[in-house]
């Protein structure tokens, strides 16, 4: 009887330990829902013009030290992959009353920018890669700002409004840099 009780207790303790490992900490919630929006800032047409004007470099296949500029399409595709990955992680966070508004706002923000990256940002990248004129690129950037910048800023600002007191409450040190 004593052996059975001990085995049951150990099984219960291990189960409790394993389930507690699946509960994100406040810092996990904050990092995924708020801090990772750094991946999508700055956002908008003017920001896109600046980021695409000076493309990053990549290693030339088969070499260890030779680089070549990335196409703008590659830059946008990389951005799309990062936003999709971040969105998947945010959606996987367990629901909690304390974090619900913050997490839902972050999801809305990611879901807001994703179609813009897949649409207008790709079009802007194509203008760069295929030699579109500066006038065409500026017009596309202005279109992005006109259509999306206000919505982005509203969601972003709301997320920061929710994130600041959450970080303070849980002693998460954050450099807000004027936000």
Question: Can you annotate each of these PLM segments?
Answer:
Residues 21-77, 172-179:
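Immediate post-signal-peptide N-terminus of mature secreted/exported proteins
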Residues 50-67, 90-97, 120-135, 166:
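Secondary-structure edge/capping motif, primarily at the C-terminal ends of alpha-helices
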Residues 51, 79-89, 116-120:
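Amphipathic, well-ordered alpha-helical segments in soluble domains
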Residues 85-108:
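Short, solvent-exposed, charged loop/turn and helix-capping segments
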Residues 101-179:
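Extracytoplasmic electrostatic interaction patches
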């Amino acid at each position: 009887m004593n052996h059975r009780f001990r085995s049951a207790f150990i099984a219960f303790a291990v189960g409790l330990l394993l389930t507690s490992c699946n509960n994100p900490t406040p810092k996990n919630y904050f990092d995924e829902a708020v801090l990772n929006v750094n991946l999508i800032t700055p956002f908008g047409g003017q920001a896109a013009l600046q980021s695409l004007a000076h493309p990053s470099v990549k290693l030339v296949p088969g070499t260890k030290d030779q680089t070549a500029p990335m196409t703008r399409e590659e830059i946008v595709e990389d951005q799309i992959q990062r936003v999709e990955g971040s969105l998947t992680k945010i959606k996987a966070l367990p629901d909690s009353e304390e974090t619900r508004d913050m997490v839902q706002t972050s999801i809305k923000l990611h879901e807001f920018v994703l179609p813009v990256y897949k649409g207008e940002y790709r079009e802007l990248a194509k203008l760069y890669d295929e030699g579109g004129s500066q006038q065409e690129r500026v017009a596309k950037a202005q279109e992005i700002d006109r259509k999306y910048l206000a919505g982005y800023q509203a969601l972003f600002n709301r997320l920061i409004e929710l994130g600041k007191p959450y970080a303070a409450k849980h002693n998460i040190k954050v450099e807000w840099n004027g936000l």
